[in-house]
A protein has these predicted regions:
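N-terminal "arm"/small-domain region of PLP-dependent enzymes with the aminotransferase-like
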Residues: 1-63, 154
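Conserved core of the PLP fold type I
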Residues: 62-157
Length: 157
């Protein structure tokens, strides 16, 4: 056999990408976007203070970062008024959603979400064999009552 030997679950997943990045879309179009709002990027770029902080920290980039993100987690916790153990730092929303699904979902378990919500969440649920139930938007918005009703009917936690 050549190539990786995927588990049956991974082999059964569609070859679809839940989020196509703007760079991929730009290459397909053959031109750059004038505005990248879909990627949740600031049209203003980083603040001068952020640029200065990155420049000041550049000489430390030869070291691995603190895997516990101790200073960052403690700073966020202090700002938000929570304990540091209640703060999770990740590589972005895609990774954090993956952690959430791994920590809280068992195979076959009912998961309820809005139809049209963040697609990577659905991708992670499928990847961990959750049973996804979608609820339509009502008047272009989340429908909390319908979400709660679906959760109660499906036994989602």
């Amino acid at each position: 056999m050549t190539g990786p030997r995927y588990t049956p679950l991974v082999a059964s997943l569609p070859a679809a990408v839940p989020f196509v990045g703007p760079e991929t879309q730009e290459r397909a179009l053959g031109k750059q976007f004038r505005c990248r709002l879909g990627a949740n990027e600031s049209v203003f770029g980083p603040s001068p203070k952020v640029i200065a902080a990155m420049a000041n920290a550049a000489c430390e980039t030869w070291m691995y970062g603190d895997p516990e993100n101790y200073e960052l987690r403690n700073s966020i916790a202090k700002h938000e008024g929570v304990a540091p153990e209640n703060v999770i730092v990740g590589e972005g929303i895609d990774g954090l959603l993956g952690y959430l699904v791994r920590m809280c979902t068992s195979a076959g378990e009912a998961i309820v979400t809005s139809d049209g919500a963040y697609p990577t969440f659905n991708y992670h649920v499928a990847g961990f064999e959750g049973n996804l139930h979608k609820v339509a938007y009502r008047e272009d918005a989340e429908d909390p009552a319908a979400l709660l009703d679906k959760a109660q009917k499906t036994g989602a936690k």
